[in-house]
Amino acid sequence: MPTQMEVEYWRRRYQRMNYERFAAANVIALITHAATQPLDMVRIRSQMLQEGKTFSGLGYQKGWYPFQIMEEIYAAGGGLRKFYSAFDTFFFRTVGYTTARVTAFGYFYDKVNKDPRRVARPDFLVAAGVLGGFIAGVVTNPIDIVYNRMQVDELYPQAARRNYSNTVQGLAKVAEEGALFRGAGANGFKLAAICSSMTNIYDWCKENSYFFFGPHWINRLWGTAVAVAIGTVVSMPFDMIRTRLHTMRPLPNGQMPYNGMFDCFNKIIKYECNSKWMSNFGSFYAGGEAYFLRLFLICYLSQFLVDYYNENYYDQEFWQPQRFHYQSGIDYDIHDPYTDAFNKKLVATYTTAAGGMGAAHPSGKDNLAII
């Protein structure tokens, strides 16, 4: 008869991408990205309106507030469909990004975490996030260029618009320019920053708040908020650079405004972040409110969808291996195959629920009560 630890090992031994994870991850991504796509449109248009201008203050982009941009997009006609540019490109971008990110991260995570019953060390988790995120960003760069250009096309005069009608035409036009991997480095670093920064912070926040609040919904809420805030801070400068490189056009002299990621970074610092013009580093965070809110909603909603998928009934980390002992701190040598959520579920079911361990009570009828 195998022990519970052996059962857990064999049940969790495969940590890479498989058909089940492919289907679950992409369905969840399509739901959450579809619900938050209008915020992505606001984010990228805020970044385009910031180009070439100084940034004074924090929390607004030279007077272009996120909700004002959203209202103007909607008022321009086309209804909600306008926020999605082209449904086929939105679909391919979401599925491609999700598949590449989960596949790459799972591959490297499997390499650094040999025991699937435990969570990898924080530094190993960061390494897997950096490698997996960077590769995913580079691989999905062509479809990102097409989609980003579609999102900002209406900001240009009619004669200067690219007018991509679908994904295939957009990819063909970008390939003619020889720009399929323009900005791929910045795109890779953006995803690397997101994947490597948020998981560890989220775990740390939840583990420490559990000591004070117990199994409460506030743990998930504030842990997600803190992780997304840090993820926004470290990833958005790369996102700004990526947007500039993806959407740039030749200047009147025939030259491109940016010669690469580092040149773009230096020019933003020199012309848009210069303190002589009452500006600051906030130029890299134009559209930051929409960026943060979208990322938060995606992360927070995804957790509940994963709960539903696993039939956990919103018990947090119901079957995830426990790695935190609340009385003694983190200890990777002690392993309990059951989580606190599962143990509490057992207590609630078999000691207080009707028909649980009533037979063990002296009367044979009353249930045991936890005092």
Curated annotation (Swiss-Prot):
Segments annotated as Solcar repeats: 16-111, 120-208, 215-304
A Pfam family: Mito_carr
Key words of the record: Membrane, Repeat, Transmembrane, Transmembrane helix, Transport
Location of the protein in the cell: Membrane
Paired cysteines (S-S): none
Keyword Cell division: no
Protein name: Macronuclear solute carrier homolog CR-MSC
Protein species of origin: Oxytricha trifallax (Sterkiella histriomuscorum)
